Amino acid sequence: TDALCDSIPIVVITGQVPTHLIGNDAFQECDTVGITRPCTKHNYLVKNIDDLPRVLHEAFHIAASGRPGPVVVDIPKDIQFAKGSYSRPNEFPHRGYKPKLDGDPNRIRQAVELMARAKRPLFYTGGGVVNSGPKACALLRELVKLTGFPITSTLMGLGAYQASDPQWLGMLGMHGTWEANW
């Protein structure tokens, strides 16, 4: 759960009973996919050795792209011991994973209207800005300058906005500044 909440890209490889025993309440069987679904970005149960190279490449891609997060790859015992051939996939498009990268103009307009009506506006930023790269940090600086709103950040967002700027209140939280937490 921490890795998902903190946007930590991690691939976790777990073991499972042999494929023919899955769903039979076998000794040491665990519904890893079901248990980890709420706290992972994506998860896999590999039932064919030939799928393993593609699944591993997809898992690392999904863990590190978009909003980073944990991905679980559950490998049954018979697949762990199976022999297969490895060939790097040319492409590994994941049909079910397509993060939306463009902003929705209507939602942006609504956000601007809310900001204009706010009585005590404040930018509360986090690690998503840092993970989005230098362009996002530059756009954040431009937005703060344009609006004149004060800005604060979580621990994971430190560095996205310069601490020497007069609009900067400091970091939020238990170890943050009094101003940011007020």
Label the predicted regions:
Residues 1-182:
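N-terminal alpha/beta PP-like core and its mobile active-site loop of ThDP/TPP-dependent enzymes
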